[in-house]
């Protein structure tokens, strides 16, 4: 997998915006990606130094369409801690 296949999209929410004060950024990542692969992908794409990666699997939510019930897909979330002084400019306008 290359770096752009591992990192699916950044997550910009109120909670994640508060984490940015502590140099932590959140991303939706490929479900099969490991912490080492996520670290290398972030360092390659954004040219920053990653000190820690925390991952979690998020279960899909129950959704209804008329009388039919289904679930949204499960996905994986990664919270990446950057080295002191490094920033990701993509999040700064949020």
From Swiss-Prot:
PROSITE patterns: RIBOSOMAL_L23. One of the early assembly proteins it binds 23S rRNA. One of the proteins that surrounds the polypeptide exit tunnel on the outside of the ribosome. Forms the main docking site for trigger factor binding to the ribosome. Belongs to the universal ribosomal protein uL23 family. The keyword Cell inner membrane does not apply. NCBIfam families: PRK05738.1-3, PRK05738.2-4, PRK05738.3-2. Gene3D superfamilies: 3.30.70.330. Pfam families: Ribosomal_L23. This is Large ribosomal subunit protein uL23. GO terms for cellular component: ribonucleoprotein complex; ribosome. The gene is rplW. Keywords: Ribonucleoprotein, Ribosomal protein, RNA-binding, rRNA-binding. One of its GO terms (molecular function) is rRNA binding. InterPro entries: Nucleotide-bd_a/b_plait_sf, Ribosomal_uL23-like, Ribosomal_uL23/eL15/eS24_sf, Ribosomal_uL23_CS. One of its GO terms (biological process) is translation.
């Amino acid at each position: 997998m290359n770096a752009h296949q591992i990192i699916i999209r950044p997550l910009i929410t109120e909670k994640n915006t508060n984490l940015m004060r502590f140099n932590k950024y959140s991303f939706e990542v490929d479900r099969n990606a490991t912490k080492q692969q996520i670290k290398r992908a972030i360092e390659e794409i954004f040219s920053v130094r990653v000190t820690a990666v925390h991952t979690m699997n998020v279960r899909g939510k129950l959704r209804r369409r008329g009388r039919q019930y289904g679930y949204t897909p499960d996905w994986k979330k990664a919270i990446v801690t950057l080295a002191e002084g490094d920033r990701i400019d993509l999040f700064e306008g949020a």
